[in-house]
């Protein structure tokens, strides 16, 4: 069965003024879609035919991994964002962030540094480790925490195509704007153990 491009969970213009309609049209409809098309061209006739996207990400390498992980990462990223979102988490997630980082402001500062400091194209992540603790991670290219057994909670796409139309080379300005869109309800669901299937 062929993989399909999941629709955005909101309208293309819903994240303005922080992320423009034009960026989402290119980022989702073209870049994300290209990874889906590539994956559908690469998988037939391989051991990965008939596997779920998550299974492919965890067990593949090379071109199949790169495209599968980028499909998964992008679908996860879209869900990490929402219109009229941002602010701070509450409840158990907020408690865990405070325990791991000292305060929400310290977490925000460290996550921002991790994302802005990712070398080249990649992703900044908040993950839950197997022991339940929270940690930050930076992955290069198509890197995905699923391959290390971590549970992704939040990601910021720092490939240039995520922000270049709106912010040109100013990655820090994009990451600053990202905080206005974080969908803490979704992040909390991941923290509480809801399994995300892209």
Curated annotation (Swiss-Prot):
List the InterPro entries hit by this protein, alphabetically.
Mn/Fe_SOD (IPR001189), Mn/Fe_SOD_BS (IPR019833), Mn/Fe_SOD_C (IPR019832), Mn/Fe_SOD_N (IPR019831), Mn/Fe_SOD_N_sf (IPR036324), SOD_C_sf (IPR036314)
- Give this protein's Gene Ontology molecular function annotations: metal ion binding; superoxide dismutase activity
Q: Tell me the superkingdom of the source.
A: Bacteria
Note whether Oxidoreductase occurs among the keywords. Answer: yes
- What reaction does this enzyme carry out catalytically? 2 superoxide + 2 H(+) = H2O2 + O2
The UniProt keywords, alphabetically, are:
Iron, Metal-binding, Oxidoreductase
Q: Which residues bind Fe(3+)?
A: 27, 74, 157, 161
Q: Which Pfam families match?
A: Sod_Fe_C, Sod_Fe_N
Here the disulfide bonds are none
Question: What cofactor(s) does the depicted protein rely on?
Answer: Fe(3+)
Q: List its EC numbers.
A: 1.15.1.1
Entry keyword annotation includes Metal-binding: yes
Q: Which family is this sequence assigned to? A: Belongs to the iron/manganese superoxide dismutase family.
Its quaternary organisation is: Homodimer.
Protein name, as recorded: Superoxide dismutase [Fe]
Source organism per entry reads Pseudomonas putida
């Amino acid at each position: 069965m062929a993989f399909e491009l999941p629709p955005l969970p909101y309208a293309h213009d819903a994240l303005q003024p922080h992320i423009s309609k034009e960026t989402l049209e290119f980022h989702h409809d073209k870049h994300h879609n290209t990874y889906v098309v590539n994956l559908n061209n690469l998988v037939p006739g391989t051991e990965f035919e008939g596997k779920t996207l998550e299974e492919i990400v965890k067990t593949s390498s090379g071109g199949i991994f790169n495209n599968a992980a980028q499909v998964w990462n992008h679908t996860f990223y879209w869900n990490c964002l929402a219109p009229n979102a941002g602010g701070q988490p509450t409840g158990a997630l907020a408690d865990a962030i405070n325990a791991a980082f000292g305060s929400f402001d310290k977490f925000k500062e460290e996550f921002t540094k991790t994302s802005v400091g990712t070398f080249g194209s990649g992703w900044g992540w908040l993950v839950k480790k197997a022991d339940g603790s929270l940690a930050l991670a930076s992955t290069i290219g198509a890197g995905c925490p699923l391959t290390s057994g971590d549970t992704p909670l939040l990601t910021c796409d720092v490939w240039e195509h995520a922000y270049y139309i709106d912010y040109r080379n100013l990655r820090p300005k994009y990451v600053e704007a990202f905080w206005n869109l974080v969908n803490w309800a979704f992040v909390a669901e991941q923290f509480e153990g809801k399994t995300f299937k892209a």
